[in-house]
Amino acid sequence: MKPTEYLKSVGIDIFLEGHNSYKLASTGYMDLTVETWQGGDDITFVSMCHYGEQNGDLMADSDILFKVEQEIITYREIQMAYTAYYSEDHAEIKDFMENTWVDNLIQQGHKVYEKDIEA
């Protein structure tokens, strides 16, 4: 599942105007913090991370920032099949997000417990 689909499934609208933050929890697991903000030109930035405490300081453990562009970036038809292109530099991160981290969050059952919406 794509991170944007997961966020929508737990009630987070990444396209809300402003800089918004959400905290999600699941008993026995680290809380998840999600922040969203707009960068202009139909671009939305999303940060997803877990925070842990180390020597009294908050440390991000798995902190991923990605941007969502609300337009078609690349489209190519090959024998009637859709092919998406991702930078080689980001392919490993994309695979981790879609096939590991999001699946783990779903299985762990994180739910939104706090919202800070900039109106």
Which residues make up each language-model segment?
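Acidic-enriched, low-complexity/disordered segments with a strong bias for Aspartate over Glutamate
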Residues: 13, 31, 41-42, 57, ...
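Amphipathic protein-protein interaction modules
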Residues: 51-89
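Helix-rich interaction surfaces within compact, conserved domain-sized segments
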Residues: 74-119
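Generic structural motif recognizing short loop/turn segments at the entrances and edges of beta-strands
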Residues: 18-20, 28-32, 42-44, 62-64, ...
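Negatively charged, low-complexity tracts enriched in Asp/Glu with abundant Ser/Thr
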Residues: 1-53
